[in-house]
């Protein structure tokens, strides 16, 4: 029962944070330390529940996705959409494959997450103040190949635990001239191949036999992550039509500073 409760908590954390610019990986590391949810199963669990979050995006955009897949002839709207997503996917995919092992071995710690949270927060504030109201593109369908590549290059920052894939791609979108909402929508679509590839790679490397209780925990985490992420995606897009990203930046700063203090006091290692 204790494992199922932890799975429920971690599923909520993943669903709440995956598509907000506050780093799901960072929060999973931090919360996992506090509730003592660590080890090989925890690592695989965190990978699997990301699939729940991916499915939430697919479900939210199901009409647009299905419409785009009906016509993939070169030059068509559907082809252009997924070609641009593919271009944006390449930089993080290549660099991620080359650095995956090093990152897992050396950067998955509360302290490095705290530094990334703070650095990302400062970048979010500066970029929004500088580019937030200068956008020329208010629809992700208007993004061209060069801008897609710029967003993809920005996504490389998210390989550093705590930086946030969502924050990195939204900031990249704003630098490319997109409105915050258009950047967020592009980020959501880019999440589909990016997270699916990362999850598949990690599962191929780390999947192992599990007990019945562990299978139940996976199911609880997956479903909880899906339902929570589905709620967050809808509300976050509505929020961005009227509000700033700065509250998320201030939250990142607060959590980052708190984590550094906890590490310094050896409360968290």
From Swiss-Prot:
Signal peptide: none annotated. Keywords: Antibiotic resistance, Cell membrane, Cell shape, Cell wall biogenesis/degradation, Hydrolase, Membrane, Peptidoglycan synthesis, Transmembrane, Transmembrane helix. The chain crosses the membrane at residues 41-61, 78-98, 107-127, 148-167, 184-204, 213-233, 248-268. The keyword Ribonucleoprotein does not apply. Its EC number is 3.6.1.27. It catalyses: di-trans,octa-cis-undecaprenyl diphosphate + H2O = di-trans,octa-cis-undecaprenyl phosphate + phosphate + H(+). GO terms for cellular component: plasma membrane. It is found in: Cell membrane. It is a multi-pass membrane protein. Pfam families: BacA. Its main location: membrane. It is an enzyme of class 3 (hydrolase). GO terms for biological process: cell wall organization; peptidoglycan biosynthetic process; regulation of cell shape; response to antibiotic. GO terms for molecular function: undecaprenyl-diphosphatase activity. Bacitracin is thought to be involved in the inhibition of peptidoglycan synthesis by sequestering undecaprenyl diphosphate, thereby reducing the pool of lipid carrier available. NCBIfam families: PRK00281.1-2, PRK00281.1-4, undec_PP_bacA. Catalyzes the dephosphorylation of undecaprenyl diphosphate (UPP). Confers resistance to bacitracin. Belongs to the UppP family. This is Undecaprenyl-diphosphatase. It comes from Thermoanaerobacter pseudethanolicus (strain ATCC 33223 / 39E).
């Amino acid at each position: 029962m204790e494992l199922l409760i932890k799975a429920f908590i971690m599923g909520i954390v993943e669903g709440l944070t995956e598509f907000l610019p506050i780093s799901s990986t960072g929060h999973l590391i931090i919360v996992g330390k506090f509730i003592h949810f660590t080890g090989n199963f925890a690592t695989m669990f965190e990978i699997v529940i990301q699939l729940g979050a991916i499915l939430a995006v697919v479900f939210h955009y199901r009409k647009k996705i299905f419409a785009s897949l009906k016509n993939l002839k070169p030059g068509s709207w559907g082809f252009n959409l997924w070609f641009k997503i593919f271009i944006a996917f390449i930089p993080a995919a290549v660099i991620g494959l080359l650095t995956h092992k090093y990152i897992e071995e050396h950067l998955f710690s509360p302290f490095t997450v705290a530094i990334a949270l703070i650095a990302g927060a400062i970048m979010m504030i500066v970029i929004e103040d500088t580019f937030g109201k200068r956008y020329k593109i208010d629809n992700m369908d208007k993004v061209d190949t060069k801008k897609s590549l710029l967003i993809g290059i920005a996504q490389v920052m998210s390989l550093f635990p705590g930086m946030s894939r969502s924050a990195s791609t939204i900031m990249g979108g704003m630098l490319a001239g997109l409105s915050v909402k258009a950047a967020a929508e592009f980020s959501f679509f880019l999440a589909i191949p990016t997270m699916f590839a990362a999850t598949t790679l990690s599962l191929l490397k780390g999947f192992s036999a599990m007990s019945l209780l562990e299978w139940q925990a996976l199911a609880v985490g997956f479903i909880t992550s899906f339902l929570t992420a589905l709620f967050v995606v809808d509300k976050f897009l509505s929020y961005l039509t009227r509000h700033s990203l700065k509250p998320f930046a201030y939250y990142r700063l607060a959590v980052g500073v708190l984590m550094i203090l906890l590490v310094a006091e050896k409360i968290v290692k």
